[in-house]
């Protein structure tokens, strides 16, 4: 019984995952469209909003070091990027985090 299910699942993946079904992508080196003086730090979480905009949680100019810093990051650490233009729609999170990581986006 298990062998039969394994064969069926294997056939399913073989049929569904052929090169014809794989979508290709094209790099847009103009996206995102951030201001010239903007510092995008280490991304610690990335999500997609209900309107398909990209939500980025990053560390700004903060670098990982030992001992851990005690000061909060001065830059906005959470960005909402427009899914079409790549421009910042909203940003917040300054003076909230020391060394952020992880992100969950809900409705």
Where do the protein language model's features map onto the residues?
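Sequence-structural signature of mature extracellular/luminal beta-sheet repeat domains
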Residues: 17-107
């Amino acid at each position: 019984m298990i062998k039969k299910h394994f064969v069926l699942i294997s056939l399913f993946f073989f049929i569904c995952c052929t090169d014809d079904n794989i979508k290709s992508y094209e790099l847009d080196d103009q996206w995102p469209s951030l201001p010239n003086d903007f510092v995008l730090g280490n991304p610690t979480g990335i999500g997609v909003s209900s309107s398909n905009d990209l939500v980025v949680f990053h560390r700004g100019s903060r670098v990982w070091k030992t001992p851990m810093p005690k000061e909060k990051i001065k830059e906005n650490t959470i960005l909402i990027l427009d899914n079409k233009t790549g421009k910042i729609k909203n940003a917040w999170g300054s003076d909230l985090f020391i060394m952020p990581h992880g992100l969950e986006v809900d409705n």
